[in-house]
């Protein structure tokens, strides 16, 4: 479950990878039958308004750090990703799901709403209509449904999940590292801009990369028909 302690561990992990320039990606998964099955309800029950808001803002801060980090986060969802578990998965850049995975935001059944960004990230990922349906019914959706609505990038058999996630990470690591980081940043920040402003932003970043050493190596490698050495 997603306790304040687990959130703090995730926060520390983000600190660690950001302090190490050699780390370009981070795979988030669970060794259990659930990815994250939600929050600790017994712990939440004892919170007053101030504590509840503090808990919500902690989740917001950490998940926003994931989104704003140059590191690429891959969520390998191996089972239930409910409530805060789905909110954690949505903060990842890419989600790959085991066939048995189930996703949902059941908070309204507790008289609550998602508190770690679920009301906002879900509609940005799958559209407001589908997000309202998932939230207001509190239904769990299957991995295939998640793939269909764009909440997952790929669905695989459970025993292949980590292998497939690692293969996906290897593809990302083979890219120009600055290019991959810039892709993430331009897509994230461009989503909140008007289309003309976003296109201008893209052109600026494209031209900046174009004159850099990564592009020099990548273009030469292509013309010389050899793998690029970034």
Residue map of PLM features:
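Conserved CoA-thioester-binding segment of acyl-CoA-metabolizing enzymes
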Residues: 1-29, 46, 50, 57, ...
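C-terminal long alpha-helix characteristic of the crotonase
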Residues: 16, 96-101, 143, 152-200, ...
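Short, conserved active-site loops that position catalytic residues or coordinate cofactors/metal ions
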Residues: 29-30, 35-41
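Glycine-rich phosphate-binding loop at the start of an alpha helix
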Residues: 38, 53-56, 60, 83, ...
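CoA-thioester-processing core
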Residues: 62, 66-68, 76, 82-136, ...
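Acidic, divalent-metal-coordinating active-site segment for phosphoryl/phosphodiester hydrolysis
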Residues: 138-145
């Amino acid at each position: 479950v997603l306790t304040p302690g687990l959130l703090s561990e995730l926060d520390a992990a983000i600190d660690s990878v950001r302090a190490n320039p050699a780390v370009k990606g981070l795979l988030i998964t669970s060794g259990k039958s659930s990815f994250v099955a939600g929050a600790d309800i017994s712990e939440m029950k004892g919170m007053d308004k101030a504590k509840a808001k503090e808990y919500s803002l902690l989740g917001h801060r950490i998940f926003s750090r994931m989104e704003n980090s140059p590191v690429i986060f891959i969520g390998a969802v191996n089972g239930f990703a409910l409530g805060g578990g789905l909110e954690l998965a949505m903060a990842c850049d890419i989600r790959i799901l085991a066939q048995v995975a189930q996703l949902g935001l059941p908070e309204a059944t507790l008289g609550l709403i998602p508190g770690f960004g679920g009301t906002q990230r879900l509609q940005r990922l799958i559209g407001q209509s589908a997000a309202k349906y998932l939230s207001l019914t509190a239904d769990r959706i299957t991995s295939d449904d998640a793939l269909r609505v764009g909440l997952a990038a790929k669905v695989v058999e459970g025993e292949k999940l980590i292998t497939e996630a690692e293969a996906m990470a290897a593809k990302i690591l083979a890219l120009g590292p600055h290019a991959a980081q810039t892709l993430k940043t331009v897509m994230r920040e461009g989503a909140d801009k008007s289309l003309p402003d976003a296109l201008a932003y893209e052109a600026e970043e494209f031209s900046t990369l174009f004159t850099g050493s990564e592009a020099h190596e990548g273009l030469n490698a292509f013309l010389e028909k050899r793998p690029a050495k970034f």
